[in-house]
Structure formats: C-alpha cells, structure tokens
A protein has these predicted regions:
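Structured recognition/catalytic domains enriched at protein termini
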Residues: 1-130, 136-166
Length: 166
C-alpha cells in the first residue's frame, strides 16, 4: 500500500488556538534581541475518520506530524508564490524556529489533544505579516502535505514603537 493511501480515509484539520497579535523587529544577531511574536502561536490538530467523522487519536503520535511556518505579507500570500520565492521570503522576514513537532498536551478542558507551539518565532522586518502553517505527515523518508491554515494579519513594530507584550 502506498504511504499516502492510509491518509485517504482521514481528514486533517489545523485550528489556531492563539493568534499572533504583534511583534518587535528582530535583529537576529543576539538571542536577547529577538523580537518574538506575541502571543506565541498555538495550533491544534484534529484527525477524523472520513467515513464516521469520529476523532482518530492513535494517529496523533509525536513522531508522525510536523508543522512548518512560512512568514510573509498578506500581499505575498495573495500572489501564490512559488516555493523558491517563499524560501527567499523566509530568509528576508523570518528568524527563530520555523518548525514545530507535535506535542500531546491537555487543553483548557483537560482533554488530551495534539498541539503545535511556536514559542521562538520572530520577524526581521517592520510591517503587516501573516503566517501560513503547513501540516506534514512523516511517512518513511517522505513528507506528505496534509493541511494548512493562515494566521490573522499582525503588525511588527520597530523597537521604539513596540507597544509591549500582551
């Protein structure tokens, strides 16, 4: 059976539980000077059976899923850039950790779930940005795209204009 065949009976959905609101530009030269996005984006993964729409928890193993963050302006995303252009934008705008592995945690209702936390993600330029979070399933040596979600736009300020952490 091909690696992708097992996923044809599943629905993958990412939801953003904590949207980024603002950030201070990052010089990306000193650890203390990183303008971390605030609040840290937190995502939750839901996997359901295609037939029954029931949650599938055995698939929520930490070593199976990864989410990659792509930072760009809303205008950049509307243009549907090629992967090469997106990579160039990452070098221009992003710093910090761009990927997050799945963490099995409990939500605010004490229910176990699959979460991705971006506690060290920063932006190097001022302006309005969005983050595209892309979910991949690791199947052997392959990364299989499963879902994606976009953050709300957020503003990145210069250090002088930054209103502070929320």
């Amino acid at each position: 059976m091909p690696a992708d065949a097992a996923a044809s009976d599943r629905i993958h959905r990412l939801t953003i539980l904590q949207q980024p609101k603002s950030a201070r530009t990052s010089a990306c030269t000193a650890k203390a000077d990183q303008g971390i996005i605030d609040p840290s984006p937190i995502l939750q993964l839901h996997v359901q059976s295609l037939q029954t729409r029931q949650p599938i928890l055995p698939y929520l193993q930490p070593s199976i899923y990864i989410v990659y963050a792509t930072i760009a302006t809303p205008h950049d995303f509307r243009k549907s850039p090629s992967p090469a252009v997106l990579l160039a934008l990452q070098h221009k705008y992003a710093s910090g950790l761009l990927s997050s592995g799945l963490m099995r945690l409990k939500d605010t209702n004490n229910v176990e779930g699959a979460f991705f936390v971006y506690a060290n993600l920063a932006v190097k330029a001022q302006g309005t940005f969005m983050i595209k979070f892309s979910l991949f399933e690791i199947a052997g040596i392959n990364l299989l795209p499963r879902a994606h979600v976009y953050s709300d736009p957020f503003v990145v300020y210069s250090p002088k204009l930054f209103p502070g952490l929320s």
